[in-house]
Regions:
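Extracellular beta-sheet/turn segments enriched in Thr/Pro/Gly and aliphatic residues
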Residues: 2-22, 124-126
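Membrane-proximal, glycine/serine-rich, low-complexity loop/turn segments characteristic
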Residues: 22-308
Length: 308
C-alpha cells in the first residue's frame, strides 16, 4: 500500500533560556571566581570587582590579601608582568574585560619546589577575548580649586594603555599634576623593595624621625611614567623589562612651640615655624630573565635605581 504524506512547516517559539557559569569553581588548590557574577552597580575597574569576592580584601593602598594573608604573586594570564606594582593593573583594567579571578593556595613561585609544603597565596587574572590582541586604555582628566595650599588650581592629567597577547604583555602609564600624592600611590610596590638602599643604610638600618603620613597636608606637584613589558619565550621562560620614573615636589609647614616658666612666675613661649621644600626624582630600570622549569630554575635580574 502506498501512502503519500504532505508536510507543512510550522515555527514554534521556545522560551528564552539563559545559561550562566557557576560563580565559583574549585580545582585542586585553585579557586576560580567568575567575576561578572559578583559585580555590582558602579563597579568599573578590576579593583572594584576584587572587593566583591568572598575572602578577598583590598586595602586603601591597593594591596590584596585573601583570608587575611597577603598575596605573594599577581599574574595576568599566567605571567608576572608587574611584580608588586599590580595596582597599575587592578586600577586600570576594566572589570568587564575580566572573565575569571583565580586564587591559588599553596602556591609555589618555583616549579622545582612543587613537592614542598607552602602557605603562599597567589592571584591570576583571566581576560576576555575583547581584551586580547588589541591595545586599550583609559584617560584621566581632573581639575578643581582648593582655597588652602600652594596652588589654588588643582589638576590631574594622565593616560594608561595596555595590550595582551598569548606571548606578549605591555602596560604603560603617564600622569602629571598637583593633586594629592597619586604618583606614590600608583607606583607603590606591595611586595616591598621599592626604597633606595646604600651600604650605610644596609649596615646601620637608617634613621627614622617618625614623619607623619603623607596626605593632603602636602601640597604636591608630582608625575610618573612607567612602561612594563614581558615576553613569553616558551612555556618555562620569560623575559621582562620594567622602567619607572616618578617625580615629587612637596612643601609642608611644621610648627612647634615651647613654654617656659620664669623665675618671677611669668611664662615665656618660644615658637618656630619651618616650611621645607623637597624635590625628589626616582628612576628605576629592571631587566629580568626567568627560566622556571620543573627540574631547573634560573633567575637573572639586573636592577638600576636611584634618587636625586
Amino acid at each position: 500500500t502506498k501512502v503519500d504524506m504532505l508536510l507543512t512547516p510550522k515555527s514554534i517559539s521556545l522560551k528564552e533560556v539563559m545559561v550562566r557559569p557557576d560563580p565559583l569553581r574549585q580545582m585542586g588548590d585553585t579557586l576560580s571566581h567568575h567575576l561578572a557574577a559578583f559585580l555590582g552597580k558602579g563597579d568599573v575597574t578590576l579593583e572594584d570587582g576584587l572587593k566583591r569576592l568572598p575572602g578577598v580584601d583590598v586595602s586603601k593602598s591597593g594591596s590584596i590579601s585573601y583570608m587575611g594573608k597577603a598575596i605573594s604573586q599577581f599574574n595576568i594570564e599566567g605571567l608576572d608582568l608587574l611584580g608588586g606594582k599590580y595596582s597599575l593593573a587592578t586600577r586600570n583594567i576594566p572589570a568587564d574585560y575580566v572573565t575569571n579571578v583565580e586564587i591559588v593556595r599553596n602556591h609555589h613561585s618555583r616549579k622545582i619546589d612543587k613537592e614542598l609544603p607552602s602557605n603562599e597565596v597567589s592571584m591570576n587574572i583571566k581576560l576576555s577575548q575583547k581584551a586580547k590582541f588589541k591595545p586599550f586604555g583609559q584617560e584621566e582628566v581632573g581639575a578643581g580649586y582648593m582655597k588652602d595650599g600652594e596652588d589654588g588650581l588643582q589638576a590631574l592629567l594622565g593616560a594608561t594603555g595596555m595590550m595582551f597577547t598569548d606571548r606578549l604583555q605591555t602596560i604603560g602609564s603617564l600622569k602629571g599634576g598637583n593633586y594629592k600624592n597619586f604618583a606614590q600611590v600608583d607606583m607603590i610596590d606591595h611586595f616591598g623593595g621599592s626604597g633606595i638602599s646604600t651600604p650605610a643604610t644596609n649596615l646601620f638600618g637608617g634613621f627614622d624621625g617618625g614623619a607623619p603620613p603623607q596626605g593632603e597636608y602636602l601640597y604636591q606637584r608630582n608625575g610618573m611614567a612607567t612602561l612594563n613589558t614581558i615576553c613569553k619565550v616558551d612555556s618555562n621562560t620569560t623575559f621582562k623589562v620594567n622602567a619607572d620614573y616618578s617625580y615629587h615636589r612637596a612643601t609642608h609647614d611644621i610648627e612647634q612651640s615651647t613654654t617656659y616658666l620664669s623665675g618671677d612666675g611669668s611664662y615665656i613661649t618660644v615658637g618656630e615655624t619651618t616650611s621645607p621644600l623637597s624635590t625628589v626624582h626616582l628612576p628605576k630600570l629592571s631587566i629580568n630573565y626567568l627560566r622556571n622549569a620543573s627540574k631547573a630554575y634560573l633567575n637573572e635580574k639586573f636592577v638600576l635605581k636611584g634618587v636625586f
